[in-house]
Each structure stands twice: as C-alpha cells, then as structure tokens.
C-alpha cells in the first residue's frame, strides 16, 4: 500500500482565480486524482490500496495512521507512508493574517507560547506487519503501537472544554497499553 499526506499550494491557480479569469483546472485535477501516492505506487510498481490524505498539518500523521489500519485489517503487509508540505505564499499569508505566527522558536506546550512557525519538509516511513518482517529477516527500527484521531465537533476551532475528543484519541493511540510504556509521542503541537 501507499499513503501520502500533502497539501495543495498552487499559487498560479489562485492568482488567476482572484483576477476573475477562468484558471486551468489541471492543478486541481492533479490534486484530486490523488497525485503523490499514485506516483510513488506506479514508480515502484506497487500493488495494494493507494491514498493521498489532505488534512493540513496532520496529513503525514494521518497517512501513518491509515497505514497502521491497513496492516491491522490485513489489507497490506507493507505500506509506504509519509507526508510532505512546502511553504508557499498562500498558507504563509493566511497564517500571518490570523496573527498566530511567532518570530521565536515554536514552543507548543509552553504556557508562554505565542504562535507557530511555518516550515517545509517531507518524511517517509516503511510500515510492515510483524509477520512479514520476520519472514524477510528484517529487524524493525521501531514499533508503531497505536494511532488515535478524533474530532469532537464541539466547535469549528475549539475542542470540547472537558477534553472528550482528546481523551478518545489518546485511548485509541494507547491501544490498551500503559502510558508508562510509551517512548515516543507524535503530537500535533502548533503553539497557537
């Protein structure tokens, strides 16, 4: 399987649209046709499910979560999962207009946090079922023990004050494990 998280940052389309022109929809079609993951899948002649996830800054994490679900459900033995994003004018100006960017280093869990820092990057993980790795004689570098994602629908931008959605996501991610046994948490910490 192949799953990639990404965002669409096509400035030419946006500029033409803002000028009242009828922009070429090729960029939108490329994006809607799930371009990144199918490209990787075709290039490597892979079989299995293919998905491109567009969920803003959570896309890469959600791609990894989907990979874990595919393996747990027996759809795949091995999944290439990753995420990519670029800094471009549209998201930069959007976040800047919300006055939630910071000139200081990002400190998402600090009481004195004052905003986010935009950046760009990409990362890919090869996620494989334990039985498949053992058959191939591969020693895993890490184990993905769980994944949790929850939208509590309390408010458009604010979570439920009691943390119901957060608790549900944490329980999903812990997957029945003791929190003391967890060595790494990939948290969505924007510092806003």
Residue ranges and their predicted role:
Residues 6-8, 55-59, 83-88, 146-151, ...:
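Acidic, glycine-rich active-site loops and adjacent beta-strand->loop/helix elements
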Residues 2, 40, 60, 67, ...:
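Conserved small-residue
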Residues 76-77, 182:
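Short, high-confidence coil segments that cap the C-terminus of an alpha-helix
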Residues 13-16, 187-192:
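Short, intrinsically disordered, charge-balanced linker/junction segments flanking boundaries
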Residues 6-18, 23-66, 75, 91-118:
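Conserved catalytic cysteine-centered active-site region
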Residues 101, 105-184:
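Condensing-enzyme catalytic core mediating Claisen C-C bond formation in acyl metabolism
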Residues 1-8, 38, 140-146:
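Short coil-to-beta-strand
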Residues 74-75, 137:
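Glycine-centered short loops/turns at secondary-structure junctions
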């Amino acid at each position: 399987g192949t799953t990639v998280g990404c965002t669409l940052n096509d400035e030419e389309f946006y500029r033409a649209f803002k000028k009242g022109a009828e922009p070429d929809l090729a960029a939108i079609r490329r994006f809607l046709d799930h371009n990144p993951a199918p490209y990787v899948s075709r290039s490597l002649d892979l079989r299995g499910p293919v998905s491109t996830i567009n969920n803003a800054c959570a896309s890469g994490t959600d791609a990894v979560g989907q990979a874990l679900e595919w393996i747990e459900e027996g759809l795949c033995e091995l999944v290439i999962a990753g995420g990519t994003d670029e800094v471009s004018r549209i998201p930069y100006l959007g976040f800047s207009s919300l006055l939630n960017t910071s000139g200081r280093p990002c400190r998402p869990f600090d009481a004195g946090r004052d905003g986010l820092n935009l950046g760009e990057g990409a990362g890919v993980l090869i996620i494989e079922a334990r039985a498949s790795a053992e058959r191939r004689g591969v020693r895993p570098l890490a184990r993905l023990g769980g994944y949790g994602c929850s939208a509590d629908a309390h408010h458009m931008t604010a979570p439920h004050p009691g943390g119901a959605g957060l608790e549900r996501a944490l329980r999903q991610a812990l997957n029945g494990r003791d929190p003391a046994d967890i060595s790494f948490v990939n948290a969505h910490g924007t510092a806003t």
